[in-house]
Each structure stands twice: as structure tokens, then as C-alpha cells.
């Protein structure tokens, strides 16, 4: 955080990358509570020196159990995390396939997790929907499901600026 704070518009704490060994263990309650408290304390220290408070958002795995997902959301609200990115790449996929899956393969899971998160979080916690956003209709649906923002990756890779143009047409 020290290195990026002055340059960033916001800081994403990614505890969900399927490509970093043991990183997802940070979402377990013992590790997560300590980690997020340290991150938020560091942010407050840096905000005082910089006269600006950069938002901290947490990127969550779509593979969390409902129980742990709820614990992460509750702890995020308790520590004043500014937002959650729901979701990252999934590791639950076809037998024998290595790496993470994204795009259409996690669309339904991302929608389910967004609905669940919205049902337990307050309006002060920004929800950023990611995962399976391939079309304008997908984006409209996430906004209807009460996403505050969207984050495009796979859809942008496959559709390029056409998807961006379509998303700007949404009222």
C-alpha cells in the first residue's frame, strides 16, 4: 500500500487469485480479520499524510462457501472497507483442466453471489460485479441486481471496445 497509495485512484486487495499459491487461504477468518484490519489501519495512516482517503476494495473468490462469504462481508463492513469486487476467476471447473475459469462459465455464480452480498450488506458498501459480463444484457442484468459498478475482463478481451460502447448506452 505504501508504494501505490499516492498513485492509485483506489486499491484492490485481491485475496482470490487462483494463480497465486495459497493466496486464497487469506480469506479464511483467522487470516482475513488480521489482514483486513492491517490494510485499513495502513490506509488511515497514509490518508492523514496525503490529505486524501483512497477507497479500499476487496476482490472475493466465487468459490467461497456461503458461510465464509458472509463472514468476509460482515468483517468488511465492520472495518469500513469501501467495496467488494464480486467475483474473481473460479477454480471449480472441468476435471483435468488446470488454471481458472472466467467469462460465461461463472456468470450464474457471479449473479448468485451478487444477490447474496446485496442481501446482507448495507448501502455504504459498494458492490462491483465482475465475472460473466459478456454482453450489454449481462451488464444491464447486474445493474438490476443492484451492482453499483461493473468490472469487465473476459468480455472486453473477446468483444473489445464494442462491449464498452454498448455499456455506455445503458440508461
Regions found by a protein language model. Give the residues of each.
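Glycine/Thr-rich beta-alpha phosphate-binding loop at enzyme active sites
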Residues: 19-31, 69-123, 163
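Short beta-strand/loop segments at the ligand-binding rim of alpha/beta enzyme cores
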Residues: 45-64, 117-129
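Glycine-rich phosphate-binding active-site loops on the catalytic face of alpha/beta enzymes
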Residues: 15-17, 83-93, 139-166
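Recognition helices and adjacent regulatory flanks at domain boundaries
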Residues: 107-110, 129-141, 151, 156
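Metal-dependent enolase-superfamily TIM-barrel catalytic cores that perform enediolate-based chemistry
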Residues: 1-48, 55, 61
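A structural motif
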Residues: 8-10, 81, 147
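Hydrophobic faces of well-ordered beta-strands that scaffold small-molecule active sites
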Residues: 11-14, 56-60, 84-86, 125-131, ...
Amino acid at each position: 500500500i505504501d508504494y501505490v497509495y499516492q498513485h492509485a485512484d483506489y486499491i484492490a486487495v485481491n485475496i482470490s487469485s487462483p494463480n497465486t499459491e495459497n493466496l486464497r487461504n487469506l480469506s479464511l477468518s483467522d487470516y482475513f480479520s488480521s489482514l483486513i484490519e492491517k490494510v485499513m489501519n495502513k490506509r488511515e495512516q497514509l490518508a492523514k499524510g496525503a490529505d486524501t482517503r483512497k477507497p479500499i476494495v476487496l476482490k472475493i473468490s466465487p468459490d467461497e462457501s456461503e458461510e465464509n462469504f458472509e463472514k468476509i462481508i460482515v468483517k468488511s463492513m465492520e472495518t469500513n472497507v469501501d467495496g467488494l469486487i464480486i467475483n474473481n476467476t473460479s477454480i471449480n471447473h472441468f476435471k483435468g483442466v488446470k488454471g481458472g475459469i472466467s467469462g460465461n462459465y461463472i456468470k450464474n455464480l457471479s449473479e448468485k453471489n451478487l444477490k447474496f452480498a446485496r442481501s446482507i450488506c448495507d448501502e455504504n458498501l459498494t458492490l462491483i460485479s465482475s465475472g460473466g459480463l459478456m454482453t450489454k444484457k449481462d451488464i444491464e442484468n447486474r445493474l438490476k441486481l443492484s451492482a453499483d459498478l461493473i468490472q469487465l475482463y473476459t468480455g472486453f478481451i473477446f468483444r473489445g471496445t464494442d462491449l464498452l460502447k454498448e455499456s455506455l448506452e445503458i440508461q
